[in-house]
Amino acid sequence: MKIGIITPMAEEKITLIAALEDVTTKQHGGTEITSGRYKGHEVILTESGIGKVAAASATALMIDNFEPDLVVNTGSAGALDPDLKIGDEVIGTQVAYSDVDVTVFGYAYGQVPNKPLYYQADPTVVKDFEQLAPVKEGLIVSGDQFVQDTAKKRILIHFPEALVAEMEAAAVAQVAYQFGTPFIVLRGVSDLANGDSGVVFDDYVVEAGRASAKLLLSYLDSKA
């Protein structure tokens, strides 16, 4: 299997790179792409940078140049579901934008014109991950903001079922959708999307990234 991995931050890819063999790194249009192998799988990994544009650019570059069988977006997120706690892992079975509003033209809140409101993760891959660990799964929402109390309330008005919020997954999903490439999103909870989120995030972002990486490596182990 050839798997493409998009991580927003360096802290979120440490565990993944450490697990690879035959590692090489090259620049592609200003984006650093790391290639390696893990138990027979070809792994392509990039740190996209934070935000939707950065994530979309990195995803398009990866798919166009390397044609992975599966795109995985890993990293951290802020909890919207009150049952989640720091360190928990979430599988995004579907993702949506939390900051797109063209409702004046008859689209649903969060829907980009002429695109689906929800981008669906590959159901077969989701089922495979379900066998690995008892994690929460459901809707992940993305927007270009670090979510705290006020934004959290607004998001939950539009997406009351959302589990976590972050800044890249929907952009990764939209690009994968347009290329016809299967995808899945794995996010570790780094903060509770409240008034203390900024401080807590700095303390737990590495732990959250490590949780996502370990779950992904378990999936690759199961496919070896």
Can you annotate each of these PLM segments?
Residues 194-224:
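His/Asp/Glu-rich mid-to-C-terminal helical/loop segments that flank catalytic regions of hydrolases
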Residues 1-63:
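N-terminal short beta-loop-beta anion/metal-coordinating cradle
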Residues 61-65, 83, 174-182:
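Alpha-helix C-terminal capping segments
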Residues 44-48, 141, 186:
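Active-site-proximal beta-strand elements of phosphoester/diester hydrolases
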Residues 146-195:
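A C-terminal functional module that forms or caps the active site or interfaces directly
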Residues 79-160:
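Mid-sequence, gly/pro-rich, charge-dense loop/helix-turn segments that line enzyme active sites
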Residues 67-69:
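Proline-aspartate-enriched helix->loop->beta-strand connector
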